[in-house]
């Protein structure tokens, strides 16, 4: 049995191509940012939860967003 898929002219051709090209770099930045966040969170955990920060969860989320942006910048520069 021979399976041949010719996707030319299909409306989702660009969507599938775009997802396969543009999703992996963001996923790499997300995963690398998570690793950076784990290290930074471990270093700053005592200060964040000591009461100096008004809302520790928002601080954690902000640090995570900064780490993902930093990881994306590192991946772009590399």
UniProtKB/Swiss-Prot annotation:
Pfam families: DUF1656 (PF07869). Keywords: Cell membrane, Membrane, Transmembrane, Transmembrane helix. The chain crosses the membrane at residues 20-40, 57-77. Its main location: membrane. It comes from the Bacteria. InterPro entries: DUF1656 (IPR012451). GO terms for cellular component: plasma membrane. It is a multi-pass membrane protein. It is found in: Cell membrane. This is Uncharacterized protein YdhI.
């Amino acid at each position: 049995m021979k399976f041949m898929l010719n996707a030319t002219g299909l409306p989702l051709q660009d969507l599938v191509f775009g997802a396969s090209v543009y999703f992996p770099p963001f996923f790499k930045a997300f995963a690398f940012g998570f690793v950076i966040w784990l290290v930074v969170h471990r270093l700053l955990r005592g200060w964040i939860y000591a009461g100096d920060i008004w809302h520790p969860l928002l601080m954690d989320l902000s640090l995570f967003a900064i780490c993902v942006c930093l990881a994306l910048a590192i991946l772009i520069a590399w």
